[in-house]
Amino acid sequence: MQNINEIEELIKLISKLPGLGPKSAKRIVLKLINNRDELVKPMANTLAQVYKNVIRCQSCGTLKSNSLGCNNCENSKEKYNKICVVEDIADQWSIENSNIYKGYFHILGGTISSAGQRKEDLLINSLVERVSRENIEEVILATSATVEGQTTAYYIEDSLKKTSTKVTKLAQGLPVGGEIESLDDGTLYSAFKNRTGIKTNSD
């Protein structure tokens, strides 16, 4: 293939996306080039709008329009007494699509890890503030069954010790190393239904 700088750069960028390597990236780039008017123009416009207008809510971590309030927390149409804590937005979407949980979400933005992700980088302090401010009765820890996910869950539990809120975690049985977004609806349903208490509001 003749080296064209713009194409090579696009292949490099696309190959950075989750689950995509150089071969898959090349196929995607060829598809885009062969469908410029149908795909490239509208995609470029949409990406520009997303870059300009979509941000993370500083309180709960979900995505929101920078010109509107957050529908997950401040402008929610429903009032709940539960918060489900997840690592990232993909986990929130998976749980929402399964229709097994009705309540607020709190997106941490990652996990505490040895790779340099610190607890200060995550939205843990804002979670504690939400729990107190919104009179939350239960916090459900839905972090992944990885060392990093469990370490993060333990830290959150410790951070909530001074509150009267019940803290639960998804039931055991999640595959070790499994990430929430990769679980099927049946596994998620069982994990939520059989969740176990870590800290009760009588502690």
Curated annotation (Swiss-Prot):
Gene name of the record: recR
Species of the source: Pelagibacter ubique (strain HTCC1062)
PROSITE patterns noted in UniProt: TOPRIM
Domain (Toprim) ranges: 81-175
Database matches in SUPFAM superfamilies: Recombination protein RecR
NCBIfam families with a match to the protein in the record: recR
Function: May play a role in DNA repair. It seems to be involved in an RecBC-independent recombinational process of DNA repair. It may act with RecF and RecO.
Protein name, entry field: Recombination protein RecR
UniProt family annotation: Belongs to the RecR family.
